[in-house]
Regions:
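N-terminal mitochondrial targeting presequence
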Residues: 1-25
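TRNA-recognition modules of translation machinery and tRNA-sensing kinases, especially anticodon-binding
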Residues: 21-288
Length: 288
């Protein structure tokens, strides 16, 4: 179904370009994001990319992919809350500290990230909202939004793109009655950690096969590293005679949950780029 829609919309998708904003809106964007702070490195060009909300446009390739993913999760037994309008301006605590990303990490540097002040920035990933929603009591949710990184612009890189974050916590019953995870090494070797990882992989394999509209789609898992998950994985699919990386994920790191006041809970998280999937499924040769 999705592939049929993608084929029909490919000519339209290839013609999509950055929107031109009215002058008044441009001025508002620049006044908010170009703060005059010594650490501000947001340019007028970047300021005017914020708030386009391409993922909310139902006929746009990103909107189609987002709606398809949300439809898959709506069909699962677990009920997922959906967020797609969070403010792209976050704090360094939200974007980095809450997620085990240390001060010396290159992703925090001004060469990689757009800062408004020394403590505020344009989010570099939708994971910046993970701890916020967990603290608010959301136990399963999807969060989609525009993210910003100081990438060199080419056919596959653009400084503004879109991600979706997914999180699921497990109940005490699902964890075989376990609530004491203070021994972190024992946790990683436990049957309960395996339960979470297996559920994560089964859920995401189902998602990707649903998005690609192919129940026989070949997938493979690779171990990886992310500061905010342990263990961590990458999922690849074999599509049009080549392996493609489609998402990263893992079991939520114990330290992340402890900071949220959830030391007795365990769960998983994933993050995927909407542009990556849209470029493949809609045969879009240039991310711009």
């Amino acid at each position: 179904m999705l592939l049929a829609v993608a084929r029909a919309l490919r000519p339209v998708a290839r013609s999509v370009r950055t929107q031109v904003r009215p002058r008044s809106t441009v001025a508002e964007a620049e006044s908010r994001f170009i703060t005059g702070h010594p650490d501000c490195n947001v340019t007028p060009y970047i300021a005017n990319l914020v708030g386009r909300d391409l993922h909310k446009k139902s006929a746009h390739p990103l909107g189609i992919i987002k709606d398809r993913i949300e439809a898959y999760f709506a069909g699962l037994e677990t009920s997922y809350d959906v967020f797609d309008g969070e403010d792209p301006v976050v704090t360094t605590t939200q974007c980095f500290d809450d997620l085990n990303i240390p001060p010396e990490h290159p992703g925090r540097s001004k060469s990689d990230t757009y800062y408004l002040t020394d403590t505020e920035l344009l989010r570099t990933h939708t994971s910046a909202h993970q701890s916020q929603h967990l603290r608010q009591g959301h136990e399963a949710f999807l969060c989609t939004g525009d993210v910003y990184r100081r990438d060199e612009i080419d056919a596959s890189h653009f400084p503004a793109f879109h991600q979706m974050e997914g999180v699921k916590l497990f109940s005490e019953e699902e964890m075989n009655g376990q609530t004491d995870f203070s021994d972190k090494e024992a946790w990683l070797a436990s049957p309960e950690c395996d339960i979470v990882a297996k559920d994560l992989k089964a859920t995401l394999e189902g998602l990707i096969k649903y998005v690609f509209d192919d129940p026989d789609l070949q997938t493979r898992w690779r171990d990886d590293y992310f500061p905010f998950t342990e263990p961590s994985f990458e999922l690849d699919v074999f599509y049009q005679d080549e392996w493609l990386e489609v998402l990263g994920c893992g079991v939520i790191h114990a330290d992340v949950l402890e900071r949220c006041g959830l030391a007795s809970r365990r769960g998983w998280a994933f993050g995927l780029g909407l542009e990556r999937l849209a470029m493949v499924l809609f045969a879009i040769p240039d991310i711009r």
